[in-house]
Every structure is written in structure tokens, then in C-alpha cells.
């Protein structure tokens, strides 16, 4: 009955598999939603497509977006800027479409400040050893950078209490199933539908 779309925020430490889980949701059409493409100043990784995975832009263009108030949130992570364009998110939610954001932990905190009605999911690894192996498997960063990411992951995991749900990414299939269950439940939660039913009673 609700007209407004659901904002779903998928976050977690670097290397936990946010992008992989997001891709599985998209490719398998697990539930209908619009994916909000983030903007970044980092270079594309192998296989990443501009406009699909990220909008890859220069630092100058990114700072222009900041100054113009075009971003819902942004952050500088390991020397690169990441941000979420605000306009498309607001437009899609207004049209009643569910929107999926895949962002880092700092970004998720900023989104919660501006859009507290969103559903915030923390994607966590089974353990830190598994996270270390996943970062090594990427083959894109030095051991020093990986150690830094693991250290940051420890701190980020302790911030899980600020989220609505925690999903362990032991396998992509399991993580996707849990996220779908969360979305299904949120669509019928009383806090999201109560206003519609109040209107129904008043109009009868």
C-alpha cells in the first residue's frame, strides 16, 4: 500500500564482498529495485564498467559535486573519494521504487543522519582471517594496505550496533537469501504501512 520506496543500504568492511553480493542481487533479479551508482575518483578495477559499477570521475569533478550539494554522502577512503549522488536517490524513492545503496561504513553513517527511515544492513565476514584472504585474492593492494584495511575492519565491525541487520557473507547465496528475507519483512512492517491503513480507515 505504501507509495514511497524503500531505501536499502548495504555496507560493511572493505573486502567483505559488498560488490559481489550486490551483483548477485542484480543479475538474479532477487527483488525489484533500482541500484544507485556511486561516484569515485579511484581507477576502475578489472571488469568494472563506468556508469554501471561506479561513475569514475576526476578529483576536480568530485569536488565540484560536493560544492554543488549533489551528494547524499561522500568520504575519502585510502586516498580516493567515494560518494552517492543525491538527485537520483530522491527521485526514485519518490516514484515508489526501492533503492539499493552499496557504500562503505562512513558513508552509511552519513546516509542514516539524512535518511533515518532507510534499512541499514551490515555485511560481515565469517571471521577476519577470511577477510584477509579475500583482500589478498583481489591482488590489487600491497600487504601494508591490506593490514590497514583489516585494522579498520575491526573498528567498523564494532560499529555494527548502529545498523538494523547483520548478514554474514559466508557464501554469496546465503547472504542474498538473508537480504531478500529482510526486504520482504520490511515491506510489511507496521511502521511502514500504518499511515496507509490509517488513511484507509478515515476514508471509509
Swiss-Prot record:
* Keywords (A to Z) from UniProt: ATP-binding, Cytoplasm, Kinase, Nucleotide-binding, Transferase
Keyword Membrane listed? The answer is no
Q: What class of enzyme is it?
A: transferase
Residues that bind ATP, according to the entry? 12-19
Tell me which EC number(s) this protein carries: 2.7.4.8
Annotated Gene3D superfamilies = Guanylate Kinase phosphate binding domain, P-loop containing nucleotide triphosphate hydrolases
Q: Taking every annotated instance into account, which residue ranges of this chain make up the domain Guanylate kinase-like?
A: 5-184
Keyword Nucleotide-binding carried by entry = yes
Catalysed reaction, written as an equation: GMP + ATP = GDP + ADP
* Pfam families documented for this protein: Guanylate_kin
Main localization of the protein described in the UniProt heading: cytoplasm
Q: Where in the cell is it found?
A: Cytoplasm
> Which InterPro entries does the record cross-reference, listed alphabetically?
GK/Ca_channel_bsu (IPR008145), Guanylate_kin-like_dom (IPR008144), Guanylate_kinase (IPR017665), Guanylate_kinase_CS (IPR020590), P-loop_NTPase (IPR027417)
A GO MF label: guanylate kinase activity
- GO CC terms of this entry: cytosol
Q: Mind telling me which HAMAP family this protein's record contains?
A: Guanylate_kinase (MF_00328)
Q: Which family does it belong to?
A: Belongs to the guanylate kinase family.
Q: Which NCBIfam families match?
A: guanyl_kin (TIGR03263)
Q: What does this protein do?
A: Essential for recycling GMP and indirectly, cGMP.
Please give the name of this protein. Guanylate kinase
Q: Can you name the source organism?
A: Lactobacillus acidophilus (strain ATCC 700396 / NCK56 / N2 / NCFM)
Phylogenetic placement of the source organism: Bacteria, Bacillati, Bacillota, Bacilli, Lactobacillales
Instruction: Name the gene behind this protein.
Output: gmk
Amino acid at each position: 500500500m505504501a507509495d514511497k520506496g524503500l531505501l536499502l543500504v548495504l555496507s560493511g568492511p572493505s573486502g567483505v564482498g559488498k560488490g559481489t553480493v550486490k551483483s548477485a542481487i542484480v543479475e538474479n533479479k532477487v527483488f525489484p529495485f533500482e541500484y544507485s551508482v556511486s561516484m569515485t575518483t579511484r581507477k576502475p578495477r578489472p571488469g568494472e564498467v563506468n556508469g554501471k559499477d561506479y561513475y569514475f570521475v576526476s578529483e576536480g569533478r568530485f569536488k565540484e559535486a560536493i560544492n554543488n550539494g549533489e551528494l547524499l554522502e561522500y568520504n575519502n577512503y585510502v586516498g580516493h573519494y567515494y560518494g552517492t549522488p543525491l538527485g537520483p536517490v530522491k527521485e526514485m524513492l519518490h516514484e515508489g521504487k526501492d533503492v539499493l545503496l552499496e557504500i562503505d561504513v562512513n558513508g552509511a553513517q552519513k546516509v542514516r543522519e539524512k535518511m533515518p527511515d532507510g534499512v541499514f544492513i551490515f555485511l560481515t565476514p565469517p571471521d577476519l582471517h577470511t577477510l584477509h584472504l579475500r583482500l589478498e585474492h583481489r591482488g590489487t593492494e600491497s600487504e601494508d594496505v591490506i593490514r590497514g584495511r583489516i585494522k579498520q575492519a575491526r573498528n567498523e565491525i564494532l560499529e555494527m550496533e548502529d545498523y538494523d541487520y547483520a548478514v554474514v557473507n559466508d557464501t554469496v547465496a546465503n547472504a542474498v537469501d538473508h537480504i531478500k528475507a529482510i526486504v520482504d519483512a520490511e515491506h510489511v512492517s507496521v511502521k511502514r504501512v500504518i499511515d496507509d491503513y490509517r488513511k484507509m480507515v478515515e476514508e471509509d
